[in-house]
């Protein structure tokens, strides 16, 4: 699971990210490349097209939704099953849930690892990342390099208790 979150847990406003952090976009690409992605329909709409070199799975209740280059599932369980199959085929160990708020809320109990870009601002928004319970432990924190006028931010990897391993944050 991967997200960029403000201090007050905001991840989006009116279908958009409330910030522009090029280094975070590079981090997102490095962490998700070649891994199956699970996202809600609104998140897919905000991206606007399938992300290359990744299986894009869109979860929606809309039974008429279709889009070239994505696979559509109508519940999270079937999305996880499809992503699991693809992860085995690709030889990757992670499935990446990339949003939005409803999908994060539903998927968090199933997650064992989180990659969060924690942005040191409070912003108004309408989409939020769920609170983490005490079962999550910070494993690694790397300070970002904000450009002038950008807020400070850190790239943070969390593991659920009992799920820690030696996988470090990707370089670059």
PLM feature segments, named:
Residues 2-165, 169-170:
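Flexible, gly/pro- and Lys/Arg-enriched active-site loops
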């Amino acid at each position: 699971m991967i997200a960029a979150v403000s201090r007050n847990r905001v991840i989006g406003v009116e279908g958009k990210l409330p910030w522009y952090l090029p280094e975070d976009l590079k981090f997102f690409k490095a962490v998700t490349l070649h891994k199956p992605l699970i996202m809600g329909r609104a998140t897919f709409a905000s991206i606007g097209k399938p992300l290359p070199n990744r299986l894009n799975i869109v979860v929606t209740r809309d039974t008429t939704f279709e889009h070239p280059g994505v696979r559509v599932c109508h519940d999270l369980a079937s999305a996880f099953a499809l992503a699991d199959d693809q992860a085995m085929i690709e030889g990757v160990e992670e499935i990446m849930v990339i949003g939005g708020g409803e999908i994060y809320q539903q998927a968090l109990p199933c997650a064992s690892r989180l990659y969060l870009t924690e942005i040191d601002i409070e912003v108004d928004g309408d989409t939020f990342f769920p609170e983490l319970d005490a079962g999550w432990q910070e494993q690694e924190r790397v300070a970002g390099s904000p450009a002038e006028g950008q807020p400070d931010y850190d790239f943070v990897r969390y593991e659920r208790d009992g799920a820690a391993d030696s996988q470090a944050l990707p370089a670059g």
